């Protein structure tokens, strides 16, 4: 049996104790992947330019063509894009479909639409669209309470998955495929330091580990391939029990995935450890009464400010500090 016990421990080294837990039994752990354990996906510059393309480029019928993908691959990370760069920081942890929807809604707000769209952009519709955008900045993902014309919803529902697929194409070309290939040869290079050993340590204590991601999971390629490349064993009874992911066209916020997983496994959230670097999983973890550990670099000042505001219990830079074995013991 594993337990967290921070009594007698103090912040120092690579561990910051934000909100002490005391002593508590841990049976399950929910882990984010990107930035928390794997470094393969350098997603922020790719997402930034993909969203920027959507909100400024007009969303014409060919906005997601292969030619556009190649153009975005070449331009990814080449210049600062203040609004979308900031949105990627603020929205880390949201489902990719919500992040893509932001780009579509900003295009509507800016009037960057194809003439063929013929949307009913009345002052009321634009005001409601602006409300949704503001709520996205605050980390919300569900907006069914805001009434919108069917034509607006249909346009967003048609364009958003297409933008998601374009983003994945650009991600693959800009970094993901190259980094995954290198990870097969040099897996430690593409893991957060100490990540694999820490996961093995938790598994050895009897903790059941689950990966939860906003990426789409499919049998071959994608996130599943990346996780295997950095040497995490997945399957019942293995280091990681399962990989829970998203869908191309159905929004699946991480907090909802986590709640469904706890219900399915009949897990008391107070005995779960949540480890991540995104706002959604960490706020959900604190809201559900889990033990929460944010994995954030020392210079991630805005993210650290946000996570402290959510009320996380601990912040770590990586998993190398021996104090983690004192914090979590048998």
What does each model-identified segment do?
Residues 244-245, 312-323:
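Short acidic-hydrophobic, aromatic-tinged amphipathic segments that line or gate anion-handling sites
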Residues 228, 250-266:
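Short loop-to-alpha-helix "cap/lid" segments that border enzyme active sites
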Residues 199-206, 262-263, 282-289:
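Surface-exposed amphipathic alpha-helices with a cationic face
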Residues 17-20, 25, 30, 149, ...:
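Short, acidic loop-to-helix structural element flanking the phosphoryl-transfer center
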Residues 196, 200-210, 214-245:
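Substrate-recognition/cap helix-loop segment adjacent to the acidic, metal-dependent catalytic center
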Residues 2-80:
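Active-site neighborhood of HAD-like aspartate-dependent phosphohydrolases
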